[in-house]
From Swiss-Prot:
InterPro entries named among the record's database cross-references: Histone-fold, Histone_H2A, Histone_H2A/H2B/H3, Histone_H2A_C, Histone_H2A_CS
Cysteine-cysteine disulfides: none
[ST]-Q motif, short sequence motif: residues: 140-141
Region feature (Disordered): 1-22, 121-143
Keywords from the UniProt entry: Acetylation, Cell cycle, Chromosome, DNA damage, DNA recombination, DNA repair, DNA-binding, Host-virus interaction, Isopeptide bond, Meiosis, Nucleosome core, Nucleus, Phosphoprotein, Ubl conjugation
Phosphotyrosine modified-residue sites: Y143
Gene3D superfamilies (UniProt xref): Histone, subunit A
Gene name of this polypeptide: H2AX
KW Nucleus (keyword) present: yes
GO cellular component: centrosome; condensed nuclear chromosome; extracellular exosome; male germ cell nucleus; nuclear speck; nucleoplasm; nucleosome; nucleus
Cross-link (Glycyl lysine isopeptide (Lys-Gly) (interchain with G-Cter in ubiquitin)): K14, K16, K120
Protein name per UniProt: Histone H2AX
PANTHER family for the chain: HISTONE H2A (PTHR23430)
Similarity comment text for this entry: Belongs to the histone H2A family.
Amino acid sequence: MSGRGKTGGKARAKAKSRSSRAGLQFPVGRVHRLLRKGHYAERVGAGAPVYLAAVLEYLTAEILELAGNAARDNKKTRIIPRHLQLAIRNDEELNKLLGGVTIAQGGVLPNIQAVLLPKKTSATVGPKAPSGGKKATQASQEY
């Protein structure tokens, strides 16, 4: 009888991470540890790191989606800092959120003030209508 081990005992369930329970890719346990070690508050609730990890994951996915579109527009398959810069600065809400952030190697948005653009020449304007009493019935030649 001896040496047979425990019989009828319940097998312990496989460990499941808090990230997988919440359906997230970002690490809930690491966020919890960082919240505790950062001394932001004396105590940290169980839901706080899950919520914060979800917010961080959403923001990251949003930025990467826009940066991927910018990379595709430039016919590239790899996202570089320039694509991140274009994605953030062209989006009104992300630009407001990350207004004080400098992205290394990001460059600037292409922007030329309207007053600096060359003026339209008189050659592009069609001939004036005759000043006689009759109105011109000719169709405009401007394209």
